Amino acid sequence: MAAAGAVACGSQGISSEIASQPENVQHGAQLFSERCSGCHTLEVVGAQGTTLNVRERERVDGPNFNTRHETPDNVLYAIRNGGFSGAIMPQNIVVGKDADDVAAFLSKYAGR
């Protein structure tokens, strides 16, 4: 996994790999790190969710984006509707262009 070797840089903790991406992907990574990493797992931004129990992680924290790929449309659906069926994710945690940027970031890096 190429992202595993990425080094965090700057005060935002964005990896050098992400820093070379278009501005919307960089912004999406920053927003994901700030607003989503408390519950979701994604190694490229150092997000691990809240539980260390791998068997419980997805049920408690939501999708593990290290292994689950999502399309931008699916990400936007989850953001607008508080996740998928039965989810406990806050609805509209990001909106407008911010939501689009998170969707662009996740569709590029999730499931890699």
Language model segments and positions:
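Sec-dependent N-terminal signal peptides
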Residues: 1-2
